[in-house]
Regions:
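Eukaryote-biased recognition of intrinsically disordered, low-complexity regulatory segments
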Residues: 2-12
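Short polybasic/polar patches that bind polyanions
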Residues: 9, 28, 117
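Aromatic-flanked redox-active Cys/Sec active sites in thiol-based oxidoreductases
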Residues: 12, 40, 144-146
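Short, well-ordered turn and helix-capping elements at secondary-structure junctions
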Residues: 12-14, 183
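N-terminal cofactor/phosphate-binding cores enriched in small/glycine residues
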Residues: 15-71, 81
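Residue-level recognition of oxygen-bearing side chains
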Residues: 22, 154, 197
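Fe-S ferredoxin-like electron-transfer domains
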Residues: 50, 54-191, 200-210
Length: 210
């Protein structure tokens, strides 16, 4: 009988392709934990944080969370180039992040803080290019601090895809991109149902419970 097993190679090890939706799931299956902000298996892949980058032979560097596994792929998850790219991406996020870690409610449970430590970020080589904005305290259930948002999109997808509400979304483009309610209103003015699901997936102190 012909062998129909499909495999790919991760760091020199042959791995069988099963029901995994993307390379990140394949990599996690063999016990390798790549850094990531914006990936949740129950939400659509977004690929914004650029931390789960891998090298795919013949294709270059790709986001593992948004790349489907294919038979014959040869993948490398760790190299000097990948480590430097991940470090730069964290530094860029920190450059526009309100760094008040000691007093932040998410201190020591903040994904950004933990990844900065893990990736060895000791200094930030980039300048802040965005201006800090007022904190939104209008909601009875949560506080929204746009100055701690890393644009991972987790809250946007959770609100839209799981809750079916869409109270918040991306606004503007490029370096002016932000996550906010429609027309940049406060949360109390839009169809937020105060479910708290956005708080659960937020990796930083941008959304916190009251």
């Amino acid at each position: 009988m012909e062998n129909t097993k499909k495999t790919l190679t991760i760091n020199g090890h042959e791995v069988e392709i099963g029901s995994e939706k993307n390379l990140l799931e394949m990599i996690r299956k063999i016990g390798i934990e790549l850094p990531t902000f914006c990936y949740h298996s129950e939400l659509s892949a977004y690929g914004a944080c650029r931390l789960c980058l891998v090298e795919v032979e013949g294709r270059g560097i790709m986001a593992s969370c948004s790349t489907a596994p294919e038979a014959g792929m040869k993948i490398r998850t760790d190299s000097k180039q990948l480590r430097e790219m991940r470090k730069i991406n964290i530094e860029l996020l920190l450059a526009n992040h309100k760094r008040e870690c000691p007093s932040c409610i998410r201190s020591y449970s903040c994904t950004l803080q933990n990844l900065a430590r893990r990736l060895g970020v000791e200094e930030i080589r980039y300048k802040q290019i965005t201006e800090f904005e007022p904190i939104d305290e209008s909601s009875p259930s949560l506080t929204r601090d746009p100055n701690k948002c890393v644009l991972c999109g987790d809250c946007v997808r959770m609100c839209k895809e799981v809750q079916g509400i869409g109270a918040i979304d991306f606004t503007h483009r490029g370096s002016h991109s932000k996550v906010a309610p429609a027309f940049e209103a406060d949360l109390a003015s839009v169809e937020c149902i105060n479910c708290g699901q956005c708080v659960q997936v937020c990796p930083t102190g941008a959304l916190t419970p009251k």
